[in-house]
Amino acid sequence: MLHGGGKMVIAAEDRACGAGHFGRFIVDEGVEVMSFHWEADFEMSGRSVLAVRPIVWKNGWPVAGDNFKGGNFWIESERRGYALELTVDFVRMQQERQGWFNRNQMEQPVKPIANQTLAEVINTWPKNDIPARISDYMNRPHQRWTITPVNEAGGYLSNPYFKITIEGTDRALAATADKEVTTVPAYTGADEQLWRIEQLTDGTYRIMPKAIPGQEGINKEFCLYSAGDSTPTLAKYDFNSDNSKWNFKRH
C-alpha cells in the first residue's frame, strides 16, 4: 500500500451498495470466506445487512468471489478439462452424413443441426443406479446437470446444500458407502445426495457430499476427486492437487 498498491475487495452490486468492514475466516486450506456489510441492501428496504462471500486471491490481493447459486452446467475437472457424466453408451446425433461420397451437399444451403435431446437418449439409459465417469465434453444430455439449492436441508458457512441432477430428470448424484460416486434414479433428499459447493481461493470449486453412507456425522474431509482422466471418486480434499478442484460451465 505504501508504494501505490491495493485492489478493491468488493464494489457495489445490482441490488446492494456500500460494502464495509472486512473479516477473514479460514475454513480449510484454500477455502476462505469474508464477512462484510452492505450499507444498503435494496431487497431489505435499503437496510444495512451482514453478508458472507468466498475470498479469491489475485496477484496477492483478496477479492470477493461469488456465492454459488446453482443453475444448469456441465461440471469440468480442473485436472484435464473433462466433464462429469453418466456412464452410458454414446449415441450419435441425428444428421445427414457428409463426405466425398455425397458431393452434391455442397450445392445445398447450410442449416443448423439440432442438439441431441434428452428424449432421444433417455430410454437407452439403465433404469437403476448409473455410475459417474469423466470424459470429454460433447454437449450431450448425460453431461448436462441442474444444480439446485435445498434450503430445508441445512447448510454451511455461506450457502445451503445443493442437489445435483441430470438436467430434465430427477436422477441425482450421490456418494456411496465405498467412497465412490454414482447416480440414483430419483432424488430422495438423503444426505449422501446433498452437496457442499465452495469457491476456492484460486477461483475453482470444491464439491463435497454432506454425508457418506456408513460414516457418522457431517462429512468434512472427502470431496469429489478426479482419480484419473476418466474416474471420479471420493478422496481426502487436497488444495495442492487439481484432482480436488472443479469448474462450472454454463451451457
Locations of regions flagged by a protein language model:
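Short edge beta-strand segments in beta-sheet-rich domains
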Residues: H3-G5, A19, R47-V52, R140-H142, ...
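Beta-rich carbohydrate-recognition and catalytic domains
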Residues: M1-R15, E29-N72, V181-V184, A227, ...
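Short, glycine/charged-rich beta-strand-loop motifs at protein surfaces that mediate ligand recognition
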Residues: M8-E13, H21-F22, D41, I207-P213
